[in-house]
Amino acid sequence: MINYTDSSYTESNLIISDNGMGYDVDKYTKIIRESIELELLKENYPHEHELLDGIFYLILETVLNKNDTILIASNKYPTELVRDKFLKLNYMHINYALHCMDNNTTKVHNIKKYMLTILFNAPSTISGYYQAEVSHDYQQLTVNSK
């Protein structure tokens, strides 16, 4: 019988896809940690370590997905498209996702689906979001200075 809690027991981190190519979990773990700057995020959000780890593992899980499609916001997208977008996520995208969560006022029934949607859309919506914030702040500043 194998003792799974014994520290000497190790399994391969290699996941084999349908086409025979290997996806090394360690390789993607390193790539994602570096691209989102996970340690810097944890420094800047000291009370959000668990949430940040959850976001990191959600990205990793999505990148390693072997299905043909991934369901995001009630739409099926090719896994390769989703993987490509998730591998381009960076510190600012995660920061944006945290802001979206903080500013959300509606009840989220499925947090995983909600986070997948935010992360998938982040590269496309981040600029518009911050531009709207700047415009709003500027308008408030001019109104208050009169």
What do the PLM-derived regions correspond to, one by one?
Residues 19, 33, 37, 72-79, ...:
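A generic structural signal for ordered alpha-helices
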Residues 79-146:
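Short, cationic/aromatic linear interface patches
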Residues 55-66, 73-88, 101:
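Amphipathic alpha-helical segments that form the core helices of the histone-fold
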Residues 4, 9, 23, 28, ...:
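Sequence-level detector for tyrosine residue identity
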Residues 1-66, 146:
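Charged low-complexity intrinsically disordered patches
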